[in-house]
């Protein structure tokens, strides 16, 4: 399974509950994007980041797209 290079976010598992509270297994997948970035000014590298992490990093300046 792929995971976010910064936050470590990966697929989560749990149950989908119906009105009668029957349990069916399901998963929640993070919105992973393969991007080439510079993290904190280091060399450019290709990593997987969630869209949420990418947006936050671009806004606060810790991530720079290449």
From Swiss-Prot:
InterPro entries: Bacterial_rp_bL28, Ribosomal_bL28, Ribosomal_bL28/bL31-like_sf, Ribosomal_bL28_bact-type, Ribosomal_bL28_sf
GO molecular function, one term: structural constituent of ribosome
Species in which this protein is naturally found: Oenococcus oeni (strain ATCC BAA-331 / PSU-1)
Keywords annotated in UniProt: Ribonucleoprotein, Ribosomal protein
Protein name, as recorded: Large ribosomal subunit protein bL28
HAMAP family, per database record: Ribosomal_bL28
SUPFAM superfamilies (UniProt xref): L28p-like
Top-level taxon of origin: Bacteria
GO BP term, example: translation
Pfam families: Ribosomal_L28
Gene3D superfamilies in UniProt: Ribosomal protein L28/L24
Gene name, Swiss-Prot/TrEMBL: rpmB
A cellular component annotation (GO) from this entry: ribonucleoprotein complex
Similarity annotation: Belongs to the bacterial ribosomal protein bL28 family.
């Amino acid at each position: 399974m792929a995971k976010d290079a910064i936050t470590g976010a990966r697929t989560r598992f749990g149950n989908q509950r119906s009105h009668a509270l029957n349990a069916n297994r399901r998963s929640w997948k993070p919105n992973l994007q393969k991007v080439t970035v510079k993290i904190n000014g280091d060399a450019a590298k290709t990593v997987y980041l969630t869209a949420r992490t990418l947006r936050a990093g671009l806004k606060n300046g810790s991530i720079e797209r290449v």
